[in-house]
Design a protein with these regions (language model features):
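Juxtamembrane transmembrane-helix boundary motif
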Residues: 1-12, 33, 63-148, 205-288
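Alpha-helical transmembrane segments of multipass membrane proteins
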Residues: 13-14, 30, 34, 58-59, ...
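Internal active-site segments that recognize and position negatively charged phosphoryl groups
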Residues: 139-161, 165, 169
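Interfacial segments of multi-pass membrane proteins
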Residues: 27-41, 162-177
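Membrane-interface helix-cap regions at the ends of transmembrane helices
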Residues: 53-65, 117, 188-204
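Transmembrane alpha-helix interface/packing and boundary motifs in multi-pass membrane proteins
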Residues: 9-20, 146-156
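Juxtamembrane transmembrane-helix termini in multi-pass membrane transport proteins
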Residues: 18-72
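Transmembrane helix-bundle signature of multi-pass membrane transporters/permeases
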Residues: 43-51, 76, 80, 182-187, ...
């Protein structure tokens, strides 16, 4: 089943490279439902795999100038220590609180995604001018990191989706810069959690090796596409992935089917929209 790992890795890699999110929400269910992994091993394998391939995506976005590195670092100051606190509390409380927190996070993603889509169509896009962090912005970044890190540690979800949602609501960043910053922060946070899972024996290194063969080129391709795709189309994709991630996390009936159909329709619409935009540009710039 090695080629299936490669295909799954590539598809998730492209999505994460373009939107910065959806990796864990998709890969963990794939490992459990398609490949028959034990849930604990699926989570550990997904986290360490995400740390590796998201690092490649973050480096590519950094080269493309679509990363606000200082914002990511300030969020890490809060997220790394609080994620460890969340893991410790989750271990002591059991599964009841985990399920409640997971539903809260999923519901927030659905509402945030819908709100973001509405805002995208009712208003213009964010300015691409440099955004300088003020003291207040740094405090907010640490707070976002602390809250998000705690939730990730407690529920094992939202390393990309939660922080992407928080940044789009708080900071005047373009969609592609949110994607790049989100990837850098998520990669660093996942390395911490992934190392812990590796030490506890919750990682299938054979599966990770084959997943990376697909996910690394996938995330590099997706990162490149994020600067080629028109801003509004990328923002729509961003919002759709937020909503679908929330549906999957909440556990809506037939969630997996809804997510697969939604991603397929969204991908087709994105390809058609982008092709039309590129064609119209060529027509506009061609000599009369």
């Amino acid at each position: 089943m090695t080629w299936q790992f490669v295909v799954a890795g590539f598809g998730v890699g492209v999505l994460v490279g373009m939107t910065g999110m959806g990796g864990g929400s998709l890969m963990t269910p794939i490992l459990i439902l398609v490949f028959g992994f034990d849930a604990k091993v699926a989570v550990g394998t997904d986290i360490l795999h995400g740390a590796v391939f998201k690092s490649f995506g973050a480096m590519r976005h950094r080269m493309l100038g679509t990363v606000h590195a200082r914002l990511a670092l300030w969020m890490l100051l809060g997220s790394v220590p609080l994620s460890l606190v969340g893991v410790q509390i989750a271990s002591s409380l059991g599964d009841g609180t985990d399920g409640t927190m997971t539903r809260i996070v999923g519901s927030a993603l659905i509402l945030g995604g819908v709100g973001f889509l509405v805002k995208t169509f009712l208003t213009g896009h964010a300015d691409d001018a440099p955004f300088l962090l003020k003291p207040r912005d740094r405090v907010v970044a640490v707070a976002i990191g602390a809250i998000g890190g705690f939730v990730v540690g407690l529920t094992s979800v939202g390393s990309g989706t939660f922080f992407g949602l928080a940044m789009l609501l708080v900071y005047p960043l373009t969609a592609r810069k949110i994607v790049g910053t989100d990837l850098l922060h998520a990669a660093a946070l996942l390395w911490v959690a992934g190392a812990s899972h590796l030490l506890h024996g919750n990682v299938d290194l054979h599966a990770i090796a084959w997943l990376l063969i697909g996910s690394i080129p996938g995330v590099l391709l997706g990162s490149q596409m994020s600067i080629k795709v028109p801003e509004r189309a990328l923002r729509v994709a961003f919002g759709v992935v937020l909503v679908l991630s929330g549906i999957k996390i909440v556990g809506v009936p037939q969630a997996s089917l809804i997510v697969v159909i939604g991603l397929a329709v969204g991908a087709l619409a994105l390809v058609v929209y982008t092709a039309r935009q590129l064609l119209s540009r060529e027509v506009a710039t061609s000599p009369k």
